[in-house]
Amino acid sequence: MSRIGKKPVPLPKGVTASISGQSIEVKGPKGTRSFSATDDVTLALDEGSVKVTPRGTSKRARQQWGMVRSQVENLVTGVTSGFKKELEISGVGYRAQMAGNVLKLSLGYSHDVNFEVPAGVTVTTPKQTEITVEGIDQQLVGQVAANIREWRRPEPYKGKGIRYKDEFIFRKEGKKK
């Protein structure tokens, strides 16, 4: 069993945390994030770090211990460096461009797809075939990237579609004559 919860979460310079009850608020150079922990764990500030300890020895308390510690670490990472997902578009005529707060995708449909970018996330298109999703909330960044990818997932024969930059597409062989 993992013992990741034992390790305290260090707070780098420029980051402050405040705990009230079961909720923690972390402020940093990129913004402010808060998280509400379950009743199975306790949160405590300890000399420039946040400690998470389980209440009791139940299985659920031990499970929540590591999970809450990872969530707090993600809060700290988000307000210091942020999170980033990069997507690539491959296919003839497939392209993306930003128009205000709307991402316009040309993906081979009879119409362009207009994707409304939610608050808390910034989407940029460095090239017509690249999309970058950035923000301080890891879950929201990943969800927005997944929603964009869902419009045209990569297909296994030619590899056309929207894929993550580091994603490997398993290619299939076509029919043989």
Swiss-Prot record:
InterPro entries: Ribosomal_uL6-like (IPR000702), Ribosomal_uL6-like_a/b-dom_sf (IPR036789), Ribosomal_uL6_a/b-dom (IPR020040), Ribosomal_uL6_bac-type (IPR019906), Ribosomal_uL6_CS (IPR002358)
Gene Ontology MF: a single term: structural constituent of ribosome
Taxonomic superkingdom: Bacteria
Gene Ontology BP annotations: cytoplasmic translation
Membrane-traversing stretches: none
SUPFAM superfamilies in alphabetical order: Ribosomal protein L6 (SSF56053)
One GO cellular component, as annotated: cytosolic large ribosomal subunit
UniProt keyword annotations, A-Z: Ribonucleoprotein, Ribosomal protein, RNA-binding, rRNA-binding
Record note on quaternary structure: Part of the 50S ribosomal subunit.
Its job: This protein binds to the 23S rRNA, and is important in its secondary structure. It is located near the subunit interface in the base of the L7/L12 stalk, and near the tRNA binding site of the peptidyltransferase center.
Family: Belongs to the universal ribosomal protein uL6 family.
Protein name: Large ribosomal subunit protein uL6
Organism: Cereibacter sphaeroides (strain ATCC 17023 / DSM 158 / JCM 6121 / CCUG 31486 / LMG 2827 / NBRC 12203 / NCIMB 8253 / ATH 2.4.1.)
Gene label: rplF
